[in-house]
């Protein structure tokens, strides 16, 4: 693939992340369950808030993976980031479709989330591959944690959303492990705490808007 073709592809990915229209390569988990069977209006609203948070997380993931691929010094690391990024694109599409089924919308602040995450990912990538991969691993660890919390918060009757979140959780564990296996190092605790605090702001805001 030529550099121009690659640039066009990455721009298309960024546009689909921010504006919508992501395409999944894998079937949507939970498709065997009825869309909103047994879920009342209040539960749908709550589930939509949680799935909007998850969608924002995937918007941020796309920005992080794209920016880090740009500055990765190793072709194998670029390939690993590309593979994980495609699975994150599946997550993006699943969450977007589920929000539509729930009669809701993605976050109105997606351009802001994407831009901020791209800048952070670029900075992590410029620090060197081991720190970049460590950042990926820590990010996936924190995402896994909040997905587990969502499985406890989602209505039990919303089997469709729960199936999506559970598969996302499984994938995030694999992505984090792949980053560690590729040479990622543990981040200093202060950085982990800052990441957690920033994540808290994002999840609280995205639940509503």
UniProtKB/Swiss-Prot annotation:
Its EC number is 1.14.99.60. One of its GO terms (molecular function) is metal ion binding. It is found in: Cell membrane. SUPFAM superfamilies: Ferritin-like. Pfam families: COQ7. It is an enzyme of class 1 (oxidoreductase). Its cofactor is Fe cation. GO terms for biological process: ubiquinone biosynthetic process. CDD domains: DMQH. Belongs to the COQ7 family. Catalyzes the hydroxylation of 2-nonaprenyl-3-methyl-6-methoxy-1,4-benzoquinol during ubiquinone biosynthesis. This is 3-demethoxyubiquinol 3-hydroxylase. It comes from Polynucleobacter necessarius subsp. necessarius (strain STIR1).
């Amino acid at each position: 693939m030529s550099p121009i073709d690659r640039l066009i592809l990455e721009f298309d990915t960024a546009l689909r992340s921010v504006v919508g229209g992501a395409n999944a390569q894998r079937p949507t988990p939970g498709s065997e369950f009825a869309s909103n069977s047994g879920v009342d209006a209040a539960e749908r609203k709550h589930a939509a808030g949680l799935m909007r948070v998850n969608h924002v997380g995937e918007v941020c993931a796309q920005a992080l993976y794209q920016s880090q691929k740009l500055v990765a010094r190793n072709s194998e690391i670029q390939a690993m980031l590309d593979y994980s990024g495609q699975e994150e694109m599946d997550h993006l599409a699943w969450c977007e479709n589920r929000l539509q089924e729930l009669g809701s919308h993605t976050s109105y602040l997606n351009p802001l989330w994407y831009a901020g995450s791209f800048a952070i990912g670029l900075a992590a990538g410029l620090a060197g591959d081991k720190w970049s991969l460590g950042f990926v691993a820590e990010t996936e660890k924190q995402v896994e944690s909040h997905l587990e919390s969502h499985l406890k918060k989602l209505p039990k009757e919303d089997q469709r959303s729960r199936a999506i979140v559970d598969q996302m959780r499984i994938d995030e564990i694999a992505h984090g492990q792949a980053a560690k296996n590729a040479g990622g190092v543990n981040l200093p605790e202060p950085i982990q705490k800052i990441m957690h605090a920033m994540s808290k702001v994002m999840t609280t805001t995205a639940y509503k808007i």
